[in-house]
Design a protein with these regions (language model features):
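Alpha-helical membrane segments of multi-pass proteins
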Residues: 2-202
Length: 202
């Protein structure tokens, strides 16, 4: 999960060329749907709801014992992560605009905070939530493996969000510096009119 969310999806979104996506996402039947799905609140809810539902033990157990559903599980996590990244990494900003810098930072922080309840439950639940812990790698008990998974989830998400915040801040700083070096065309400096001497009478 965390490789898909923290590494694969961001790299995939960053590498998508606009020329490839434009004819697909601007198709008359696709664009209205994508405009709705990529709205920050809707994308945020879809991603977090999907991620949380798949961690409910009975649902997770069903997906583990079926190769077809197991594949659907990972595809859905990857797809909804890409959807959630549109407000901050839109490959077509002229069609699906990115959030302003301040809102982008708030969105990234909200994405991080939204994972805390699930990570907390997995970290502090006194019994193993999932029965599927075979083989036991490095001799870890089921409960210790669960706690380790929660720690990996929290740390990887924290590092990913901090990286996103740092990149956003650097881009904003560069844009601000470029704007400060551009001439102000709206309020040009007043140019003094040339002084013309009165004609000398002849």
């Amino acid at each position: 999960f965390m490789v898909l969310i923290c590494l694969a999806a961001p790299l995939f979104m960053a590498s998508l060329p606009a020329w490839l996506l434009q004819p697909i996402l601007t198709y008359k039947y696709v664009q209205p749907i994508m405009r709705v799905l990529t709205r920050p609140l809707i994308a945020f809810v879809i991603y977090n709801l999907t991620f949380t539902l798949w961690h409910i033990p009975p649902i997770f157990r069903v997906f583990l014992y079926s190769e077809l559903w197991h594949g659907a599980l990972y595809i859905s996590v990857f797809a909804t992560t890409c959807l959630a990244l549109f407000p901050v990494m839109s490959p077509l900003p002229e069609v699906f605009p990115k959030l302003a810098v301040g809102k982008r930072l708030g969105y990234l922080l909200a994405m991080l905070i939204a994972h805390f309840p699930l990570a907390g439950v997995v970290a502090f639940y006194p019994r193993p939530l999932y029965p599927f812990y075979q083989p036991q790698v490095f001799g870890l008990t089921r409960l210790l493996d669960q706690y380790s998974g929660s720690a990996i989830m929290a740390v990887s998400l924290l590092l990913t969000v901090l990286t996103g915040i740092a990149i956003t801040f650097v881009q904003w700083l560069a844009n601000t510096e470029d704007a400060s070096h551009q001439p102000d065309t709206k309020h040009p400096d007043p140019t003094p009119e040339p002084v013309v001497d009165d004609p000398v009478p002849t």
